[in-house]
């Protein structure tokens, strides 16, 4: 499992940073990739990666500002050409209006998609758990931006314990169907009368990962709730320390506000994105240092960067 950032800039494309998009690679877990936001030029960014567009099966949109959605119709159209014979449907989750935005573009341009798009729209009254699979759950909660905007909390369900095959062999259990029974939690009685207690040979379940990905937002308690105990928090940092009033006026956060959210939520790692083009390299270093005075494990991400979870 890993996150790859396709665009880490704010507002409009810049030389060093494209606008918002990232993917959560779940290839080992689901053989899928989930995309979060799809700003202008996202499909061009994908060409610089190993991502196969047909593997992108779910797309989560935080809000309908252009720097988060204008790349979506183009990506969906190009995906049809890049999928070859292995066409896979796409589920799109997002605020009410995302279906109209996408379908108006598709119909007006005459694009033909050889796969189906399944839209899952919501408003402020219909949030909470928006998706559950056998391995993951996704929650959405309203943030505090200039338009309706959400953050997402991706929760991996706990992983089953693993079977200690060597310990079983040492206990005298021959390899075969009985191994499967023990793995499934069933006790087994050997020919000599010895009882193999399954739980003694299976490790404890492993806690699943929690990934929180926020859209644009002012500092708000909703961010803390979404991020509580997360392994990774992806938080915007459009402004820097000292610009709190400006950030609030425009519906955004500063680096230090993001750090306070991370600290309050007891997350393990904070990844800052949505970085304004006005910040130069020395500004970025200072932004990181200022945030680290509040929360230690802070990293300001770059376009195409991958973070393993």
From Swiss-Prot:
Residues bound to Zn(2+) 2: 67-68, 216, 274
Cofactor: Zn(2+)
Gene Ontology terms for molecular function: 3'-tRNA processing endoribonuclease activity; zinc ion binding
Enzyme class per UniProt: hydrolase
Database matches in InterPro entries: Metallo-B-lactamas, RibonucZ/Hydroxyglut_hydro, RNase_Z/BN
Binding site residues for Zn(2+) 1: 63, 65, 145, 216
Pfam families: Lactamase_B (PF00753)
Cofactor note: Binds 2 Zn(2+) ions.
Keyword Transport applies: no
Enzyme Commission number(s): 3.1.26.11
Top-level taxon: Bacteria
Swiss-Prot/TrEMBL keywords: Endonuclease, Hydrolase, Metal-binding, Nuclease, tRNA processing, Zinc
Active site per database record: 67 (proton acceptor)
Family: Belongs to the RNase Z family.
Self-association and partners: Homodimer.
Described purpose of this protein according to its UniProt entry: Zinc phosphodiesterase, which displays some tRNA 3'-processing endonuclease activity. Probably involved in tRNA maturation, by removing a 3'-trailer from precursor tRNA.
Protein name as catalogued: Ribonuclease Z
Organism: Streptococcus mutans serotype c (strain ATCC 700610 / UA159)
């Amino acid at each position: 499992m890993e996150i790859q950032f396709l665009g880490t800039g704010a507002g409009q494309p810049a030389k060093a940073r494209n606008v918002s998009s990232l993917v959560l690679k779940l290839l080992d877990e689901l053989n899928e990739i989930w995309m979060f936001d799809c700003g202008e030029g996202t499909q061009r960014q994908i060409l610089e990666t190993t991502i196969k567009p047909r593997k992108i099966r779910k797309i989560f949109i935080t809000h309908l500002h252009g720097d988060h959605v204008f790349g979506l119709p183009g990506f969906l159209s190009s995906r049809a050409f890049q999928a070859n014979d292995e066409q896979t449907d796409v589920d799109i989750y997002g605020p009410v209006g995302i279906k109209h935005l996408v379908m108006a573009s598709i119909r007006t341009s005459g694009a033909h998609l050889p796969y189906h798009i399944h839209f899952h729209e919501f408003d402020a009254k219909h949030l909470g758990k928006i998706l559950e699979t056998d391995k993951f759950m996704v929650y959405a909660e309203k943030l505090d931006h200039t338009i309706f905007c959400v953050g997402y909390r991706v929760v991996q369900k706990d992983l089953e314990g693993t079977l200690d095959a060597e310990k079983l062999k040492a206990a005298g259990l021959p390899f075969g169907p009985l191994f499967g029974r023990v793995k499934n939690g069933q006790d087994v009685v050997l020919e000599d009368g010895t009882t193999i207690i399954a739980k003694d040979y299976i490790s404890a379940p492993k806690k699943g990962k929690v990934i929180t990905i926020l859209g644009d937002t002012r500092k708000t308690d909703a961010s803390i709730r979404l991020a509580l105990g997360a392994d990774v928090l992806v938080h915007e940092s459009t402004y820097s320390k000292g610009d709190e009033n400006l950030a609030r006026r425009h519906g955004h956060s500063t680096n230090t506000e993001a750090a306070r959210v991370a600290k309050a939520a007891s997350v393990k790692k904070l990844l800052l994105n949505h970085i304004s083009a006005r910040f130069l390299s020395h500004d970025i270093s200072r932004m990181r240092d200022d945030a680290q005075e509040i929360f230690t494990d802070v990293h300001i991400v770059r376009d195409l960067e991958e973070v393993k979870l």
